[in-house]
């Protein structure tokens, strides 16, 4: 085991008293974006204008070189399809663009009961945002001296941590913005997460291929597991009970570590056919989702003992055209979102494993995604230096979604085991599919791990690095 990391903690003040925004986040004026704002979003001009954008159904990043229709003479009106660019006219999702970082935005979160946003960037900053007007509320002081690869926040939104390529993990008080402590390691840190109860911090190592679990209260080391994987860690996270740590790696392996017994509970080898980029638990802790450079996502049962040797999974395919960088479950696990290097955010129907909608607009890799607790908003962070806040509360009323449901013949059922509502294809003849949701089907079937994903023993060398890789 490595010796405990050096640190310099200061006073702790965990109570957060940030007031909620007074204006509704859903206010917007479609079609009222100024040409100056659009020009800034396009990056073609350097204008001294605010870095905020009104929530609108128009996508300034998808515009052609011509100004919007209301600024053109009548004979030069731009067709509607040019205004929408990559967006399908039947999937008009209201959104807001948040600009303020000077480099790729690597990580994003909702916090303070969805009234604030948190971001970290390769510009070495960690910022707190007001989602109503898109302004930066705070730049956290004593910032890292190298790119920020990931940040995390406690469940009560009192403390923030960030991992950086300067080999440090730093913690701040969210309300005051003051640095609480800094821990320096001997290797690069590529991932960091608070436990849901705020007691622990887990960090993932690059060169050492391991993880470190630290007591966040006393700033002492609980466990250091070197060579936990055979290649660099890409992501790690706690389960909702703060008792298990999941980690994924370039070695295509998934591992579950028990904090109390300090032992590996579960190992799934060759879980994907390429490097695994990210992982996240459902809020029950029963299932784990992994995203990969193989363009797929998988949902694994990591709770019941009978799956300890081989795992059990459902594969989500054909959602991205390139490597998948990130994934995040809704609080009730009714849907899942993922971000990809194809510049899109995919919204998945978990019950039936199909892509419900694809959100387009970013002009570079989507590096991280998040879902608000009320399930009305999606936040995406991109290498294009922006974040996007998407309003999805009326997603089931979108013409494109309705059109797809009619085409495939979806209908709503209730799971006989857990009473969870789920959708099914009318054409499916399997009786089990008509009675149980996807999670209960994994439990009852005891599906073996998907062997098709482990057929390849080599990884694509030209694949882009996952979120948290220092090669970018």
Swiss-Prot record:
Annotated region (Disordered), positions in chain: 1-22, 447-472
Cited SMART domains: PQQ, WD40
Domain of life where this protein originates: Eukaryota
Entry-linked InterPro entries: G-protein_beta_WD-40_rep (IPR020472), PQQ_b-propeller_rpt (IPR018391), Quinoprotein_ADH-like_sf (IPR011047), WD40/YVTN_repeat-like_dom_sf (IPR015943), WD40_repeat_CS (IPR019775), WD40_rpt (IPR001680)
Positions of WD repeats: 100-139, 143-182, 184-224, 228-267, 271-310, 319-358, 361-400
Keyword tRNA processing: no
Keyword terms of this UniProt record: Repeat, WD repeat
Name of the protein described by the UniProt record: WD repeat-containing protein 88
Source lineage: Eukaryota, Metazoa, Chordata, Craniata, Vertebrata
